[in-house]
Amino acid sequence: MEQREEKTENIQRKRSRGKSSSSSLPLDLTSEIFSRLPAKSVVRFRCVSKLWSSITTAPYFTNSFETRPNLMFFFKEGDKFFVFTIPQHNQNPNESYSYSSSEIIDSYHTTYPKRCCVTTLTESVHGLICFRKAATPIIWNPTMRKFKPLRKLDERWKNIKVSLGYDPVDGKHKVVCMPYGNAFYECRVLTLGSDQEWRTVKTNHKNSPFTFHGGVCYRQSRCINGVIYYRADTNSGRVILSFDVRSERFDVIELPWDENFGLVMMMSYKGRLACLGFNHEKNSRSMWVLENVEQREWSCHTYLPISHYEPGLENYFNLTGITNDGELIYVPNTVLERFHVIYFDAIRETFRRVIYKGVADKGFRLRNGLEDKPIRRLHFFPNHIETLMSL
């Protein structure tokens, strides 16, 4: 009997010591530990105590929380919305190779907002994505699995092009809406987390955002280091317009190439604006990089298409972006069973193919009641990071 009482007392002492040691951890150390965890774990720990909740919801923590960039993508099947996040980092940047990835793929499915236009999706900007439902922009936080409709624009702004920007100095996202179809001298800007009111911002550069034939330009704006870049038509011809997210000022950047260059995509190459396309005359691929914004200095890199390394690849893979390490990302236009991504470094001339398990294979289809048919219309978001920002 006495031995049992002694054991009980020992257990209670250990528990009390454990509680005192955990509660006595410095707040900065606790915050540092949380910052190294996956976002879904941090969200789960918010329910443990008021202290942990206050630490992980504080603006300084949510603004500084940043994970390693991943390749995120989704597809729709009926009213279901399947979201995947896969690693994109390269462990051997100086070598060409193929391998099957054993890393765990994070995935979930939810219900997609009805009557939303998936062709108006922006890129992933510091963890958030914006698209629209008619004239109503909607913000999506894939990490928190939340959608938030913004205040609807007035009737004069039915046809809009939506861009999403991020100011790294103040840590704020801004949604920029521009009319398309007609040239304009003004746009509408809304700062997330503020009073959610649209403000009018004017420019001295009358322009019309460039659109492809038959619709809105698909993700043709890019936010790089606090500046949104987009193609536009002006009275003097086609140019690139820049919008500084913090100062809310526009500027014009002249195109450096001639009529033989066909622009395919704008993207961020190691923190600088890059324009990828092809040369009609030489039948080659080129990448123009804006090396110096103030001096408008560009460099041009010419490289061979991926079909040079493996014939026929360009028939089945589409360019979707570039990693922070400078690798071009080619993704499949259709998935049946195996899901693989090609990463190509045009400067180093290294080529790697990665097969990811658990994406649209038989097990996945059985668990989610999907038919054994090809999956098309996948939407990809390179360099996506997790964010704990509340909408």
UniProtKB/Swiss-Prot annotation:
Species the sequence originates in: Arabidopsis thaliana
Name the record gives this protein: Putative F-box protein At1g47730
Origin superkingdom: Eukaryota
Gene3D superfamilies with a match to the protein in the record: 1.20.1280.50
Residue segments, region Disordered: 1-25
Biased composition (Basic and acidic residues): 1-12
GO cellular component: cytoplasm; nucleus
Domain F-box: 19-68
